[in-house]
């Protein structure tokens, strides 16, 4: 938790963020952890956290407005590097970057299935923003759902006639584990609609 707070604090101060979008469930957990942290800091010093306005997106659904529809800005978002060897660096991703890459990557209107987290670049860009640009669709679910029931991934691909899906290497290995994915759950699967399946985001093992 402390490591996560340190990353949030660094990014907020580096880019000057004022607002954080989240969900009610996450915000409750975050506030509880902060309360525990304040109690523990009575006996030990703790670094101050930056002030943010937290907006729960659950509460603003259905309240769409046209106020920003005609406002454009070349910067779409800042994508921070992992920071494994130094402080994370905010890389500017422009509207033009996204549109160009989407059209260079996809040759059809995609039907995507993904359990990748939305905060990960492969999940965010490849399975939420690319379909948006190309007029496609995405059927997404939580990585936790995949870990609990990996058959859900393959069954969803089969049911919605998905054309694109991706996973880190461990996801494919996970599906090869008969204890996690019994052969009985593979019956009736039809993955012939897939045009693109990518293994990326971590070292690819040839034996997989």
Where are these regions (language model features)?
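Conserved acidic residues
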Residues: 9, 18, 110, 163, ...
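Structural core segment of the AMP-binding/adenylate-forming
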Residues: 1-63, 168-169, 174
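Conserved G/P- and acidic residue-centered "switch" motifs that form tight phosphate/ATP-binding loops
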Residues: 84, 135, 201
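Conserved AMP-binding/adenylation subdomain of ANL enzymes
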Residues: 99-111, 121-164, 173-183
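Adenylate-forming
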Residues: 22-32, 162-208
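Conserved pre-ATP/AMP-binding loop-to-beta segment of ANL
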Residues: 52-80, 86-87, 92, 97, ...
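Hydrophobic alpha-helical scaffolding
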Residues: 68-71, 91, 95, 117-118, ...
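Short hydrophobic/charged patches on amphipathic alpha-helices used for structural packing
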Residues: 9, 13, 67, 150-154, ...
């Amino acid at each position: 938790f402390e490591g996560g707070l340190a990353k949030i604090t660094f990014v907020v101060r580096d880019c000057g963020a004022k607002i954080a979008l989240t969900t009610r469930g996450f915000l409750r957990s975050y506030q509880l952890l902060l309360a525990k942290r304040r109690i523990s800091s009575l006996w030990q010093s703790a670094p101050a956290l930056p002030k943010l306005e937290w907006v729960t997106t659950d509460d603003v659904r259905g309240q769409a407005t046209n106020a920003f529809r005609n406002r454009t800005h070349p910067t779409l978002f800042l994508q921070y590097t992992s920071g494994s060897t130094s402080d994370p660096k905010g890389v500017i991703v422009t509207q033009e970057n996204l549109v160009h890459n989407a059209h260079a990557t996809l040759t059809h209107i995609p039907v995507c299935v993904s359990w990748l987290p939305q905060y990960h670049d492969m999940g965010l860009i490849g399975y939420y923003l690319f379909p948006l640009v190309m007029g496609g669709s995405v059927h997404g679910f939580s990585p936790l759902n995949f870990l609990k029931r990996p058959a859900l991934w393959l069954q969803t691909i089969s049911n919605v006639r998905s054309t694109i899906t991706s996973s880190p290497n461990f996801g494919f290995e996970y599906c090869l584990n008969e204890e996690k994915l019994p052969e009985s759950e593979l019956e009736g699967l039809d993955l012939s609609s897939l045009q693109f399946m990518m293994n990326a985001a971590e070292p690819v093992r040839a034996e997989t």
